[in-house]
Amino acid sequence: MAVGLAEHDKEAWGRLPFSLTIADISQDDEPLIYVNRAFEQMTGYSRSSVVGRNCRFLQGEKTDPGAVERLAKAIRNCEEVEETIYNYRADGEGFWNHLLMGPLEDQDEKCRYFVGIQVDMGQSESPDRATELDRQLAEVQHRVKNHLAMIVSMIRIQSSQAGGVGSQFDSLSRRVEALQLLYQEMDIAGAAKATDKIIPLGAYLGRIASAINHIDGRGAIKVNVQADTVDVPVETAGRIGLLVSEVLTNALQHAFSDRASGVVQLRSSVMSGEQLRVTVEDDGRGIPEDCDWPNEGNLGSRIVRQLVQGLGAELNVTRGGTGTIVNIDIPLSQQKTLIADERTKD
């Protein structure tokens, strides 16, 4: 059985820089129903050879039974779990697999699926490597775990709204794309390889705007970006990027539904009082008077509210002379503290 994702959604999952799997725990032996390309590259197993099988084929002689039982217990209890387990690739080579798993409920609110995200921690079995492994685990937890947890959370929300993980994931692929761009920006900034975990926000938001404008596909609708220079922690950038993705997409979907051309302005400005203001302004039809977005609405509205709350930000919607203006005020004082903490750790 294969998970029912549209082809462009499979491409979005496939481009992720980490291994992702989905298992259906309602079926006998809890088989995998989807794996992405990063999983194939990490393990050496092809998708066709593993879909329909329980993931125990990754286990071997030196796999800790205790780790296996902890994972099994989490599945039985429908709980999130994080574990580092010794697994084996298709060619028999062993490696440490840092695994994060989270449950998904079906439309009847029954625990049916488990999403697994895996990070290859290397091959060494030596006890002398414990300190180095601990350091790498800390890096994974700090840089990656929060973003992977956000993906699991978004899949959970999307599946509950769409009637199960086999439904269409048109919006989800865009949300994953925003995180994929973050990882690319980390590489450009050196944050994925060095100790610095800070990235320039403006460049990241510019890439998100370009990607969303491209996905929209209407050449006569322009997205202009103007961004002050500001560095933020990677975790913060991820949240802001997802938030901007939601607001931009909302503008493109609704502001120009009755016309073929228009302009959306994306600005990020450092304000007095140690605040960052992110503005999305369009010259479209304007938000209806009876619409209380994002306090009411669809899945995107719910995600916007959660991201705003997580950033400790304030969001205000203004109906302009033409179009709509969305201002998001994010406290920079907290972000500066996080940056200072990161550099102190380094």
From Swiss-Prot:
* Pfam families from the UniProt entry: HATPase_c (PF02518), HisKA_2 (PF07568), PAS_9 (PF13426)
Q: Name one GO molecular function term.
A: ATP binding
Q: What class of enzyme is it?
A: transferase
Q: Which residues form the PAC domain?
A: 79-133
Q: Which UniProt keywords apply?
A: ATP-binding, Chromophore, Flavoprotein, FMN, Kinase, Nucleotide-binding, Phosphoprotein, Photoreceptor protein, Receptor, Sensory transduction, Transferase, Virulence
Has keyword Kinase?
yes
Query: Which sequence positions carry the modification called Phosphohistidine?
Result: H142
Q: Which reaction does it catalyse?
A: ATP + protein L-histidine = ADP + protein N-phospho-L-histidine
Kindly give the SMART domains that the UniProt entry links to this protein: HATPase_c
For this UniProt entry, which segments traverse the membrane?
Answer: none
Identify the SUPFAM superfamilies for this entry: ATPase domain of HSP90 chaperone/DNA topoisomerase II/histidine kinase, PYP-like sensor domain (PAS domain)
> Modified residue S-4a-FMN cysteine is at which positions?
C55
Every copy of the Histidine kinase domain together lies at 139-334
Q: What is its EC number?
A: 2.7.13.3
Q: Where is the PAS domain?
A: 8-82
* Post-translational modification (record): FMN binds covalently to cysteine after exposure to blue light and this bond is spontaneously broken in the dark.
What is known about what this protein does? Answer: Photosensitive kinase that is involved in increased bacterial virulence upon exposure to light.
PANTHER family per the UniProt record, alphabetical: PROTEIN TWIN LOV 1
The name under which this protein is listed is: Blue-light-activated histidine kinase 2
